[in-house]
A protein has these predicted regions:
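Glycine-rich, low-complexity intrinsically disordered segments
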Residues: 1-192
Length: 192
């Protein structure tokens, strides 16, 4: 361990593995239900390019305060997962927007309030991959530093797309927030 006198910019540089993970080097894949009647190949090809923003998920452990003689013993409670949100660039064929709306509508129809009741049918999976800057040759596949696999996702919210006469030099985008059962963290060599 470095002593206080050894903590300098050169030592910091040597500790920053890979030059630091970059927030703009990521890729998202989302599996859509086959029952939607849409071209899954077209959507799967576009998602990694048009998902503009995502997040590495949060998870939380609840807290159970147990009082004892004027003190409180904090005991770990149950795990919960925050919803996962992605931001999607909208192109003129609306293919991803259409798929998200159909997926949401298949769960609870806009007009009839009926829909698919079996989670096995409407819940799917997704991945967010943190990519490395490292590459030896142009065209080499990206190196994955870490991957998060979401199980049991479904769209909870498909956001609005603001329209505005004054909006110049902009491409439409929208957000989708997913609920999910859990996620797994995967390294390039297997589970952590």
């Amino acid at each position: 361990m470095a002593t206080f006198n050894q903590r300098n910019i050169t030592e910091f540089r040597s500790r920053l593995a890979g030059g630091g993970a970059r927030a703009n080097l990521f890729e998202v894949e989302i599996a859509f239900p086959e029952e939607l009647g849409i071209n899954l190949t077209d959507i799967s090809d576009k998602v990694p390019f048009l998902v503009k923003a995502a997040e590495i998920p949060a998870s939380n452990l609840g807290n159970i305060p147990v009082p004892y003689r004027g003190r409180v013993l904090p005991v770990a409670g149950d795990r919960t997962f925050d919803p996962w949100t992605v931001t999607i660039i909208n192109d003129t064929d609306f293919i991803i927007r259409d798929a998200m709306e159909k997926w949401s509508n298949s769960i609870n129809d806009l007009q009839t309030a009926q829909g698919t009741i079996s989670p096995e049918v409407y819940q799917r999976s997704a991945q967010v991959k943190q990519l490395s800057r490292e590459g030896t040759n142009p065209g080499d596949p990206e190196k994955v530093l870490r991957m998060y696999n979401f199980e049991g996702i479904y769209p909870n919210t498909v956001s609005n797309i603001p329209l505005d006469f004054g909006a110049t030099d902009q491409i439409e985008e929208f957000q989708v927030t997913f609920n999910y059962l859990f996620y797994e963290v995967v390294s390039p060599t297997g589970n952590f």
